[in-house]
Amino acid sequence: MADEINTSAAASTGAEGEAPAAKKSKRKGKKNILNGVVHIQSTFNNTIITITDVSGNVISWSSAGARGFKGSRKSTPFAAQVAAGDAAAKAMEHGLKNVSVFVKGPGAGRESALRALAAAGLKINLIRDVTPIPHNGCRQPKRRRV
């Protein structure tokens, strides 16, 4: 009886010692998309660029933080330019050529992100500002006194 317990304990420890089977990651194939939509969300702290097809399915995205900028450097126009160039390069791998651009937010990276998209080789058909403007909704944060 003691032998049975030891063999079952040895069998269970042997199963634990083995590494679990590695999951095979399935690489997504290249889509063939010609027209897309670029959403630029530019806040005071970061700039996020998302590129979708006309249905709203995300093709690629990038942000200043994802490109390695930290802290106050994320809110600079140069960080927005790098993020936009990265997102455009990823999207152009899927065949994207023509884009409509929707810009949201008051941040510093709005114009530089637009210029980076054009410099990457995307043809910009439309630029629209979709910044939400309240009809006197929530109270604004108090002004900073430095």
Curated annotation (Swiss-Prot):
InterPro entries: Ribosomal_uS11, Ribosomal_uS11_bac-type, Ribosomal_uS11_CS, Ribosomal_uS11_sf. GO terms for biological process: translation. Keywords: Ribonucleoprotein, Ribosomal protein, RNA-binding, rRNA-binding. Residues 1-28 are annotated as: Disordered. Residues 7-22 have a biased composition (Low complexity). One of its GO terms (cellular component) is ribonucleoprotein complex. The keyword Repeat does not apply. GO terms for molecular function: rRNA binding; structural constituent of ribosome. PANTHER family: 40S RIBOSOMAL PROTEIN S14/30S RIBOSOMAL PROTEIN S11. Part of the 30S ribosomal subunit. Interacts with proteins S7 and S18. Binds to IF-3. Belongs to the universal ribosomal protein uS11 family. Located on the platform of the 30S subunit, it bridges several disparate RNA helices of the 16S rRNA. Forms part of the Shine-Dalgarno cleft in the 70S ribosome. This is Small ribosomal subunit protein uS11. It comes from Myxococcus xanthus (strain DK1622). The gene is rpsK.
